[in-house]
């Protein structure tokens, strides 16, 4: 198992079979994926000990191959080339809208192209991090102008780094996961994909959006205006502010869309490849991140804070890997605002003229965005710092770092479905998966 090894010249498809299965997966009909999608939880080596669907798998656990994992991971969070950004708003024309924070698009949408999420994943061999949110275009094209699956997989393999050995430890019991998942979640041989979003960064981006359009916020929790905003009357309407909780619900919702639609994209790829699995939220997110307070269950190892004002711990980031745009990863919220400005307008960002792109005159398009002024950044930072000071964290009413939707992939035990279900419980791709993706193993099983 594991991921493809790095070879001289990169990962190469070693057989005609690998070329063929990749092409077949890319050409799988969208309608079949949409309407053939089901949560198929019963994997090789699984057991349901009781009830009307009791069954013991006769098959040995079979981990996903490196190629299978790369296909699924690329579908879940892969780069899809340069995104087109939001192009116009009359308020600041002829400048192009400057909302986006990433220059590249991915297999899932992100509100205004902010893209704050990244993917962690675990298998039998370890815990890994796949970094694609600020990647340049990785969409390799063949001589026919179509996507080259081999080049795409190779490019994304280079985005992965290993964090630790061994499968992520999640006790298969409550309260670490919901009881109905204890028999099938994170089982040996499976791939568990864990998208994580930076809500703190997304909220800063939302505050920038508000200021760009002449708005500001007030503290509706404590029924207070934010002190210091009067000096920005030339930028924002201080007399008609938006409520803080509205903005924070907005930020959390938009981040959740990233996490969920990424999993859904991977779910569709499961159908194309003929793998079992499902997307779900039935693992405790504090257990996964490592903020449960249980030293026996360190999870991903994110640092977190607690406070008597909060009912739950607040994760802020994994140092050196995935750090939220908030203290203690930044000394104050002004520094976090500056970091977002660098991501947008600095080298590689969506509004830097030297960043490549899809337009005939990309430098002109990217360079036409209005760069944040010092006054602009100070206005955003004033609101953000108020929230941090008043609530002890940023955002004030929702988590700084968030995860709540996951994707699992495994080899499907068809015998369970043949025994308990009417015909049609799985697709032709599931029926032929072992024959197509594991030819040598299938011959051995058939003897």
Residue ranges of predicted features:
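Acidic, surface-exposed loops and disordered segments
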Residues: 1-447
């Amino acid at each position: 198992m594991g991921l493809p090894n790095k070879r001289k010249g990169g990962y190469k498809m070693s057989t005609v079979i690998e070329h063929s299965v990749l092409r077949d997966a890319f050409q799988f009909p969208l309608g079949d994926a949409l309407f053939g999608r089901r949560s198929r939880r019963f994997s090789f080596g699984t057991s349901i000990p009781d009830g009307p669907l009791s069954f013991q798998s006769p098959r040995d656990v079979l981990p996903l191959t490196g190629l299978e994992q790369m296909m699924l991971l690329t579908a879940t969070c892969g780069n899809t080339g340069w995104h087109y950004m939001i192009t116009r708003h009359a308020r600041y024309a002829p400048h192009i809208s400057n909302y986006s924070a990433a220059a590249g698009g991915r297999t899932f949408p992100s509100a205004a192209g902010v893209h704050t999420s990244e993917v962690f994943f675990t298998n039998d061999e370890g815990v890994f991090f796949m970094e694609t949110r600020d990647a340049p275009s990785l969409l390799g094209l063949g001589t026919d102008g179509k996507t080259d699956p081999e080049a795409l997989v190779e490019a994304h393999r280079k985005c992965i780094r290993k964090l630790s050995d061994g499968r992520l430890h999640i006790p298969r019991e409550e309260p670490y996961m919901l009881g109905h998942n204890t028999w099938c979640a994170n089982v040996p041989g499976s791939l568990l994909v864990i998208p994580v979003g930076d809500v703190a960064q997304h909220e800063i981006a939302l505050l920038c959006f508000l200021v760009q359009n002449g708005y500001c916020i007030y503290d509706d929790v404590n029924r207070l205006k934010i002190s210091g905003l009067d000096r920005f009357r030339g930028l924002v309407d201080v007399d008609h502010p938006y409520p803080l909780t509205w903005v924070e619900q907005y930020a959390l919702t938009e981040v959740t869309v990233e996490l969920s639609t990424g999993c859904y994209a991977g779910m569709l790829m499961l159908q194309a490849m003929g793998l079992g699995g499902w997307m779900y939220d039935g693992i405790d997110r504090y257990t996964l991140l490592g903020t449960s307070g249980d030293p026996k269950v360190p999870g991903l190892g994110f640092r977190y804070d607690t406070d008597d004002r909060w009912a739950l711990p607040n994760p802020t980031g994994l140092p050196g890997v995935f750090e939220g745009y908030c203290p203690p990863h930044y000394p104050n919220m002004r520094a976090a605002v500056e970091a977002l400005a660098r991501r947008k307008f600095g080298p590689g960002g969506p509004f830097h003229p030297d960043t490549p792109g899809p337009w005939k005159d990309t430098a002109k398009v990217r360079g036409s965005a209005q760069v944040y002024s010092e006054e602009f950044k100070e206005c955003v930072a004033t609101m953000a710092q108020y929230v941090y000071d008043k609530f002890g964290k940023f955002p004030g009413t929702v988590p700084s770092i968030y995860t709540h939707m996951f994707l699992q992939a495994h080899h499907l035990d068809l015998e369970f479905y043949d025994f308990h279900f009417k015909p049609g419980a799985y697709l032709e791709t599931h029926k032929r998966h072992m024959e197509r993706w594991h030819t040598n193993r299938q011959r051995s099983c058939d003897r």
